[in-house]
């Protein structure tokens, strides 16, 4: 068996309250040969992260979540899991809080897919 066949796909978690947006993100990332698990509940997402051997990246769409979402960002930071925050609007407070909690980047929707994929690839490969 070649080492190429033994290579595991990078695992990315997606979190969004909006199931349709989550499904789209899962599809786009899956087409790039990533293993992707979509979540709509941050509690379940963090629990799932803790049961996995390796999570390479989490993409969190904070739309529709209350201020408690930041404690889940902090949990990811403490677990040393890189994450991106997707925000419905450009707002300095959101960007500052995301970075304070350890986000690698705060992106404003709507997303440019090509840019998102470039960023995901660079984070997963590092």
Task: Give a label for each model feature.
Residues 27-32, 75, 97:
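Alpha-helical interaction/dimerization surfaces of two-component signaling modules
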Residues 40-57:
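Acidic, metal-coordinating helix/loop segments flanking the phosphotransfer/catalytic sites
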Residues 109:
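A Lys-centered signature of the CheY-like receiver
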Residues 1-28, 46, 114-126:
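Non-catalytic signal-transmission and effector/linker regions of two-component phosphorelay proteins
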Residues 71, 90-106:
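Alpha4 helix (beta4-alpha4-beta5 surface) of REC/receiver domains from two-component response regulators
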Residues 51-53, 75-81, 101:
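Conserved phosphotransfer cores of two-component systems
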Residues 22, 42, 59-76, 91:
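Conserved phosphotransfer microenvironments
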